[in-house]
Every structure is written in C-alpha cells, then in structure tokens.
C-alpha cells in the first residue's frame, strides 16, 4: 500500500477500510461502499499520515497529524524522537484525540461532525486540506433541499408567457401557474407556447367553438341517423343534416368525417341504401379518418346471438327434466339376482361361510332349529 489510492491510483489515499484492507480516496470510498447494503456496513477511518498503510487511531493535536497505533507509540514514547512540535512540551505530553470510525456513505458535513478537527482550517495538514477540497455528491437533507429549490426555480415562473405577447390573455391562468422551462424544448417540437386549454378559442381562430354544432350540426346527434328523404320527381335525393358540409376544421387531428353514405373507411355503419357516386364522397386530409353513416351502432340481435340464446334455453330444459326424474326415483331394497339368493338361503355354513358338500358344518338352514 502506498501514498496513492489503491482503487484509482490517481488521488491521494484518505481513508482506510478494514474489511477490504485498502487505502482509498474519498471519491473511490463513496463509489465502492455505496454499491450494496453489505459494503455500506464496512467500518472505515482515516489512514495514518506517517506510514500511509495502517488505519489511524489517534489524532495528535500538537503536530496536527493522524497516526496509527505503531506510529503513535514510536513517535510519542521514544525519548529520542526528534519530530516533536515547536512547543515546549515533550512528545509524551502531546494532547491526542481518538479518531472515530464511520460506516455507510456520509456527506462532507457529516464527516466534519465525526472528525471535529476538520473544521479548524488554520494550519491544516495535508489530510485536512484534501478532505476540504474533495467534492462529494452529498446526500444530506440540507443539500437535497437546496438542490430541489434550485430545480424549482428553473421550472416554475422562469418563462411564463409575457404580457406583450401576441397571444391573447384570457381568463385562464393555468399555464402561468405551472410555468415552462426557458429552453428550446418547444422549439424542437415545433410548438408555440400557447394556452392549451382552448378557452381563448374565439380570439385565436376568429370563430366561436361549439363542439356539438361543429360535429353534428344544429340537429344534434340525431342528425347522424336520419335516412334519405324521398325527393320529388325529377330532383336529386336530399341528404340528411349530418352531411359532408358539417366537417371539423382540418387543423384539428384526428379528423372525424361524418358521411351520409358508406365510404371507403375502416369503420362503416351500413344500412343506408341509395345511389352513390364518386362525387358524393369527400376526402379528408388525414391519414386516419372515421366515417359514420346510416344506422346507429345498436343493432338487433344477430343469428349468432339467437343461437346462443336457444342453446341456453335447451340446457335449462334438460336440467329441469333431470331434476324431475331424480324426484321420482324409488330407493326401496331390491334383490338383484333372485336365483342366487334362493340358493344361498339353503346352503350349509361354518361360522357364516359357505362349505362344500361333504365337509363339516355348524349350520344347516334346512334343519329345524330347537328352542331350549
């Protein structure tokens, strides 16, 4: 183990991990011991500033160095030690502090609270200077709060719609309350920062927005299902109210076309009869258009529905017949084979079992029993 970090080999080693027996810099210490829960339990402390190979146990206040047990003993208990501080006190009388160990991934502020000598910036040792200059991604609650406030300042109220904008200012303030980011996000999408609530529809498009009239006309939804009326002789057939004249604006997507006659579309409600020509259809400027015509979507039951209903009725009738037969059953005691029973009644037995002819027996049904 040397002066540099055992993991990256670029930064100066600052802490010593007893479980891994490695000297690490603060950055590598955080990245290595934040991998899983087991590594977070490793106990670490400062590395000795004399040998750079053992964990430091004490801190010499006079010399401002962290020492391991061996370096502390050799430096303060050896009478011939020439590395004493500038003060008049002997090395044996130097004030020493015990260095605490830590585990997990503490922030720089938490490390400063564990090692209080890190707060004394005057005359710092190399170890303390490295600790002060090291930049760690702190996870403390104060840093999180500051970070969240900074992000909030970027998102909220940074680029609301100015009052001098060409977009009319309506009664809606939802877009202003939410706020938008001052970046090229909307520019990349080709979108303008306008109020998406469509409450300023009249000022934006110069016309009133009435969804029911735009979609269905003045007749409402019933106008979709009007069939052709009989036209006078010599005249053309009259189309219902929901004809090709009542279409939505081509700027709104997806475009829904309501036609009075079956057209070339993916969804079509058939049932309207009459002559049709290529001129009766109007193409819509959209890739996916839905055209509704003629009959409403609620149809009378089909043949398949009738078959399912009849099958259910047949099954219910069969169950009823089965229950009636079950009630009429008789559970009387019957003799299945009368001839076998007649022969068994006259055979001789021994302890209730049949015996062959000529063998000893203790019961003969043909012999009259005596009553003593």
UniProtKB/Swiss-Prot annotation:
<dbReference type="Pfam" id="PF06203">
    <property type="entry name" value="CCT"/>
</dbReference>
<feature type="domain" description="CCT">
    <location>
        <begin position="315"/>
        <end position="357"/>
    </location>
</feature>
<keyword id="KW-0862">Zinc</keyword>
<dbReference type="GO" id="GO:0048579">
    <property type="term" value="P:negative regulation of long-day photoperiodism, flowering"/>
</dbReference>
<keyword id="KW-0479">Metal-binding</keyword>
<feature type="binding site">
    <location>
        <position position="48"/>
    </location>
    <ligand>
        <name>Zn(2+) 2</name>
    </ligand>
</feature>
<feature type="binding site">
    <location>
        <position position="33"/>
    </location>
    <ligand>
        <name>Zn(2+) 1</name>
    </ligand>
</feature>
<feature type="binding site">
    <location>
        <position position="76"/>
    </location>
    <ligand>
        <name>Zn(2+) 2</name>
    </ligand>
</feature>
<feature type="zinc finger region" description="B box-type 1; atypical">
    <location>
        <begin position="5"/>
        <end position="47"/>
    </location>
</feature>
<feature type="binding site">
    <location>
        <position position="28"/>
    </location>
    <ligand>
        <name>Zn(2+) 1</name>
    </ligand>
</feature>
<keyword id="KW-0677">Repeat</keyword>
<dbReference type="GO" id="GO:0007623">
    <property type="term" value="P:circadian rhythm"/>
</dbReference>
<keyword id="KW-0863">Zinc-finger</keyword>
<feature type="binding site">
    <location>
        <position position="51"/>
    </location>
    <ligand>
        <name>Zn(2+) 2</name>
    </ligand>
</feature>
<feature type="binding site">
    <location>
        <position position="5"/>
    </location>
    <ligand>
        <name>Zn(2+) 1</name>
    </ligand>
</feature>
<dbReference type="GO" id="GO:0003700">
    <property type="term" value="F:DNA-binding transcription factor activity"/>
</dbReference>
<dbReference type="GO" id="GO:0000976">
    <property type="term" value="F:transcription cis-regulatory region binding"/>
</dbReference>
<dbReference type="InterPro" id="IPR010402">
    <property type="entry name" value="CCT_domain"/>
</dbReference>
<keyword id="KW-0539">Nucleus</keyword>
<dbReference type="InterPro" id="IPR049808">
    <property type="entry name" value="CONSTANS-like_Bbox1"/>
</dbReference>
<comment type="similarity">
    <text>Belongs to the CONSTANS family.</text>
</comment>
<feature type="zinc finger region" description="B box-type 2; atypical">
    <location>
        <begin position="48"/>
        <end position="99"/>
    </location>
</feature>
<dbReference type="GO" id="GO:0008270">
    <property type="term" value="F:zinc ion binding"/>
</dbReference>
<dbReference type="Pfam" id="PF22586">
    <property type="entry name" value="ANCHR-like_BBOX"/>
</dbReference>
<dbReference type="GO" id="GO:0006355">
    <property type="term" value="P:regulation of DNA-templated transcription"/>
</dbReference>
<dbReference type="InterPro" id="IPR000315">
    <property type="entry name" value="Znf_B-box"/>
</dbReference>
<feature type="binding site">
    <location>
        <position position="71"/>
    </location>
    <ligand>
        <name>Zn(2+) 2</name>
    </ligand>
</feature>
<feature type="binding site">
    <location>
        <position position="8"/>
    </location>
    <ligand>
        <name>Zn(2+) 1</name>
    </ligand>
</feature>
<protein>
    <recommendedName>
        <fullName>Zinc finger protein CONSTANS-LIKE 9</fullName>
    </recommendedName>
</protein>
<dbReference type="GO" id="GO:0005634">
    <property type="term" value="C:nucleus"/>
</dbReference>
């Amino acid at each position: 183990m040397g002066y540099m970090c055992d993991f990256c080999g670029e930064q100066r080693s600052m802490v010593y991990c007893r479980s891994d027996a490695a000297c690490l810099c603060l950055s590598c210490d955080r990245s290595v011991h934040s991998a899983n829960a087991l590594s977070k339990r490793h106990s670490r402390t400062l590395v000795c500033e004399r040998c750079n190979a053992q964990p430091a146990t004490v801190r010499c206040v006079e010399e401002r160095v962290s020492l391991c047990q061996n370096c502390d003993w050799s430096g303060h208990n050896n009478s011939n030690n020439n590395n004493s501080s500038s003060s008049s006190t002997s090395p044996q009388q130097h004030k020493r502090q015990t260095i605490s160990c830590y585990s997990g991934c503490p922030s720089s502020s938490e490390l400063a609270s564990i090692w209080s000598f890190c707060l004394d910036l005057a005359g710092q040792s190399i170890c303390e200077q490295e600790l002060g200059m090291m930049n760690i991604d702190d996870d403390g609650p104060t840093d999180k709060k500051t970070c969240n406030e900074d992000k909030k300042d970027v998102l909220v109220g940074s680029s609301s719609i100015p009052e001098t904008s060409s977009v009319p200012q309506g009664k809606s303030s939802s877009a202003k309350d939410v706020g938008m980011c001052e970046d090229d996000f909307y520019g990349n999408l080709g979108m303008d920062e306008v109020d998406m609530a469509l409450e300023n529809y009249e000022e934006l498009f110069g016309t009133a927005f009435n969804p029911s009239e735009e979609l269905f006309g003045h007749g409402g939804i019933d106008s979709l299902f009007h069939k052709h009326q009989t036209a006078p002789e010599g005249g053309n057939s009259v189309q219902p109210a929901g004809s090709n004249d009542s279409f939505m604006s081509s700027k709104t997507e997806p475009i829904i076309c309501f036609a009075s006659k079956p057209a070339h579309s993916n969804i079509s409600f058939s049932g309207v009869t009459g002559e049709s020509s290529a001129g009766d259809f109007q193409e819509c400027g959209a890739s996916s258009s839905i055209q509704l015509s003629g009959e409403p979507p609620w149809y009378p039951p089909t043949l398949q529905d009738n078959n399912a209903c009849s099958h259910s009725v047949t099954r219910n009738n069969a169950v009823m017949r089965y229950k009636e037969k079950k009630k009429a059953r008789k559970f009387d005691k019957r003799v299945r084979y009368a001839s076998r029973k007649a022969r068994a009644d006259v055979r001789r037995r021994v302890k209730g079992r049949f015996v062959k002819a000529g063998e000893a027996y203790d019961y003969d049904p043909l012999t009259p029993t005596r009553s003593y």
